[in-house]
Amino acid sequence: PHSFKLKGNKKLGGNKNLNYPFFAAKPFIRNRTLQIRNGGNDTRCRFKDPALQTIIQSSGIDIDGQSYQPVHEFINGKYIGVLNVREPNNKHYVYANYGWDEEEIDQFEMNPDSGYVQKCGTDEAFNTWYALSANAADEATYEEIKKLVDIDEYTNYMAMEFYLGGADWPQNNIKGFRRSVDGRFRFVTFDLDGAFGSNDPFNNFMGRQTYTFDPLYGCEVNRITAEIKLVTIFKNMLQNATFKKRVIDVYSLMGGSVFEPT
């Protein structure tokens, strides 16, 4: 079965919201769109991503992620199969979970075609974070960075990604957002189909400070080689002793608590 989206429509009443508690884990959120997903690149079991995200959410750790609900798909009465309903992972995720419209946020993503893409707002705060990170070892500078980034959620997110070892990250599958006025960046977990695809995720990440993005997959045409600033930022921030200790502690928490069988 194919993946598709459902979108709210003002013509059907309301304000584009789909007024129904689709997700038991988040009955309170205001969905304007839903993803009906077939498993993406996980073509065999189809639920690697929702299973991992459910484990993460159930642990109680502070990481933004998509809720999940399996559904049966019928088209004109014909049974198609089992798919999974997901929250969106873009500006509509921010609205559903935080109530901020796209005019109120800065949001970016990493795209395998072209690298960093600004989806909403401006890149001013992100570039300030990037510039400050060069001096992150200094505690005063680190405190300034903490005004731009939710350090706890960011560290949790990074440790989780390292633990799961996705093969298509960080050159892809990264989305960050913040409220434009005095907000702090948070990161949304999504598309963990490639989890466990890397046997050395930390060093693979560190080795992708420069990456060649491919607009036409498999064709040496219009390729873009660029810095992945998120790798540079993380490398720089590890120079801060406080941050480095937190990364080590949270990574240990991943294996010892979040993903520990109970």
Q: Where are the regions a protein language model picked out?
A:
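Catalytic-core segments of enzymes that bind and process phosphorylated/nucleotide-bearing substrates
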Residues: 1-262
